[in-house]
Every structure is written in structure tokens, then in C-alpha cells.
């Protein structure tokens, strides 16, 4: 018959056992909390980066990198929408060209998702500056992509109208109210 294991002794502040300060096989103590902090001593994406070694300058470089990653993710999102629109409008094109467009759209989507996950992991550093840089990057990328400054026509209303017209035409209907049958 098996004997039950004894409970560990309570910690200094209550009933819970003391938390380990180091993971087995790790040389660094676990000091990251689960609440947002302010300060330049953050670890973002890689061990000891930007960390404490280079001061505030490396921290600002880290914030600029997170901002750029988030802006690029938004720009790729706009490019993905543009590729989807091109695919919808190119039903009459050759099969080989359509397949290339589909592969390109899949590649853009994969790159966008990879960047989005990197930004998410950076925000998981629980540094408020990194969070603000990510939000600012997404906003800047959205603004640039929608304003057409990146050379994308995906934001232009006439393109959206053309896509709706192409979809309506392929369904056999028309968007113009005067072309509806009269009762």
C-alpha cells in the first residue's frame, strides 16, 4: 500500500509553499512579473536584449524595431487585401497566372502572420513601452496603407466599388438601380 506524500512546508507569508526562484537547469533566476512595467530594463524577443547592458539607447532601438514590425504587419495586411482583390477580378486570366497569384498571396499571408506573432511575443514582455510602440506601429501602418502613401490602391473607394461590381456581374445582377426589373 502506498503512503501519501507529505505536504511541503508553508511559505513565509501564508499557506502556499515558497516559489522556486530558478528553473531546473537554468542559470538565470525568474524575475519577470505578470504585470506591465515601465522602464528600459526589459527583455524583448531574445535573452538579454535589449536588457541592461546598453542603457536607454538600446531600449529605444528595441521600441523602434517593434514599431516597424507592427507597421510592416499592417502594410502586408493591405497588400494581402489587394492581392485578394486582384484574384477576384482575374477570373478570366490563365490558370497558371492565377496559381502564381495564389502562391504570392499565401506567401504574403505567411509573412504577415509571422510578423504579427513576433509583435505579440514582444508585447508579452509586459513592458508598457513595448505595448505602446506596437499599438503606434499598427496605427502608423494602417494609416500609411489606407492613405495610399505606400502605393497601394487597396484603400481607394473606386477599387472597392469595382470589386463589388465584378462580384455582382458574376452573379448575374447589376448594381445600378435603373436596371432592376419593373413589376
Curated annotation (Swiss-Prot):
Membrane-spanning parts: 56-76, 115-135
Topology of this chain in the membrane: Multi-pass membrane protein
GO cellular component terms listed in the entry, alphabetical order: plasma membrane
UniProt keyword Transmembrane helix, yes or no: yes
Subcellular localization, as worded in the UniProt entry: Membrane
Region (Disordered): 1-21
One of the record's GO molecular function terms: copper ion transmembrane transporter activity
InterPro entries, alphabetized: Cop_transporter
Family named by the database record: Belongs to the copper transporter (Ctr) (TC 1.A.56) family. SLC31A subfamily.
Name by which UniProt lists this protein: Copper transporter 4
Species per Swiss-Prot/TrEMBL record: Oryza sativa subsp. japonica (Rice)
